[in-house]
């Protein structure tokens, strides 16, 4: 996780209010001087969420340690051994984090999650906004393949027709040269096609291995709610005790 100019594990926040990289984002929110400005990113640098928490905004309950939102739209879970504010997380946020980081354990307490991984399809790889150089190379290779394939076929056919004509005229040396040229042409074409195909297959296989769809295996929905209720009660009690009357 990258937080401003600092690096922390998911769920931790650092004071980056003086960072010039986020000054425009802070001014646009209208929250005044921020207490925390945090960006949650995956290992490959993709931004997962940006969080700005103001000094005047008190914490009125548990929130997700990844997206830093409460349990308004989705219930919070405590699937690992983390306690306190780091123990609550949305199921969808955790699944997205595990998929982006290509891990199956909590990076704080190292608890192994029961997950189900499913590989992504070829169309998802083509639509993925990954490195532009890979997509550009793929487009260039496809265009070259569509252009070179008919060109190689026509050139080989013309060379063989010329070799037949020279054989009728008893010009064996010229016919042998045209046959050798045809063999060399098709050898180069086949080698280039195989190398390009293998290169892109390796890229696709690596992408599928590191970008799998992760589904967190929990018990029943009722147990998820009961699993979180002690955590929520403890946090609310702690906040109530620390709040001056």
Curated annotation (Swiss-Prot):
UniProt keyword annotations, A-Z: Cell membrane, Cytoplasm, Endocytosis, Endoplasmic reticulum, Endosome, Golgi apparatus, Lysosome, Membrane, Metal-binding, Transferase, Transmembrane, Transmembrane helix, Ubl conjugation pathway, Zinc, Zinc-finger
Query: What Enzyme Commission number does this protein have?
Result: 2.3.2.27
Membrane-related topology note: Multi-pass membrane protein
Name of the gene this protein is made from: MARCHF2
Q: Where is this region: Required for interaction with IKBKG?
A: 121-245
Q: Tell me, what's a Pfam family for it? A: RINGv
A GO CC annotation recorded here is:
endoplasmic reticulum
Q: A single Gene Ontology molecular function, please?
A: ubiquitin-protein transferase activity
Summarize where Zn(2+) 1 binds, as residue positions: 64, 67, 90, 93
What biological process terms from GO does the record include?
antibacterial innate immune response; antiviral innate immune response; endocytosis; positive regulation of lysosomal protein catabolic process; protein ubiquitination; suppression of viral release by host
Q: What does this protein do?
A: E3 ubiquitin-protein ligase that may mediate ubiquitination of TFRC and CD86, and promote their subsequent endocytosis and sorting to lysosomes via multivesicular bodies. E3 ubiquitin ligases accept ubiquitin from an E2 ubiquitin-conjugating enzyme in the form of a thioester and then directly transfer the ubiquitin to targeted substrates. Together with GOPC/CAL mediates the ubiquitination and lysosomal degradation of CFTR. Ubiquitinates and therefore mediates the degradation of DLG1.
Q: What is known of its domains?
A: The RING-CH-type zinc finger domain is required for E3 ligase activity.
- Subcellular location field: Endoplasmic reticulum membrane; Lysosome membrane; Endosome membrane; Golgi apparatus membrane
**Record's catalysed reaction(s):** S-ubiquitinyl-[E2 ubiquitin-conjugating enzyme]-L-cysteine + [acceptor protein]-L-lysine = [E2 ubiquitin-conjugating enzyme]-L-cysteine + N(6)-ubiquitinyl-[acceptor protein]-L-lysine
Task: State where Zn(2+) 2 binds.
Answer: 80, 82, 106, 109
> What protein does this entry describe?
E3 ubiquitin-protein ligase MARCHF2
Zinc finger extent (RING-CH-type): 56-116
InterPro entries to which the protein is assigned, alphabetical: Znf_RING, Znf_RING-CH, Znf_RING/FYVE/PHD
């Amino acid at each position: 996780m990258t937080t401003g100019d600092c690096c922390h594990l998911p769920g931790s926040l650092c004071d980056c209010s003086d960072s010039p990289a986020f000054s425009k984002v802070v001014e646009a929110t209208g929250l005044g001087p921020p207490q925390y400005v945090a960006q949650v990113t995956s290992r490959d640098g993709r931004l997962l969420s940006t969080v700005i928490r103001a000094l005047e905004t008190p914490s009125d309950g548990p929130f997700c340690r990844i997206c830093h939102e409460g349990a308004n739209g989705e219930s919070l879970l405590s699937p690992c051994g983390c306690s306190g504010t780091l123990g609550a997380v949305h199921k969808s946020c955790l699944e997205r984090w595990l998929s982006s980081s290509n891990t199956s354990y909590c990076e704080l307490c190292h608890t192994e999650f029961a997950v189900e991984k499913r590989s992504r399809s070829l169309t998802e790889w083509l639509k993925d906004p990954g490195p532009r150089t890979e997509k550009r190379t793929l487009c260039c290779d496809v265009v070259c393949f569509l252009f070179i394939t008919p060109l190689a076929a026509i050139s080989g056919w013309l060379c063989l027709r010329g070799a037949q004509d020279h054989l009728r005229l008893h010009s064996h040396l010229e016919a042998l040269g045209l046959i050798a040229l045809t063999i060399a042409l098709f050898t180069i074409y086949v080698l280039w096609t195989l190398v390009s195909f293998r290169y892109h297959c390796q890229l696709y296989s690596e992408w599928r291995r590191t970008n799998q769809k992760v589904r967190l295996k929990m018990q029943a929905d009722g147990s998820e709610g009961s699993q979180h209720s002690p955590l929520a009660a403890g946090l609310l009690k702690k906040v109530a005790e620390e709040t001056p009357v």
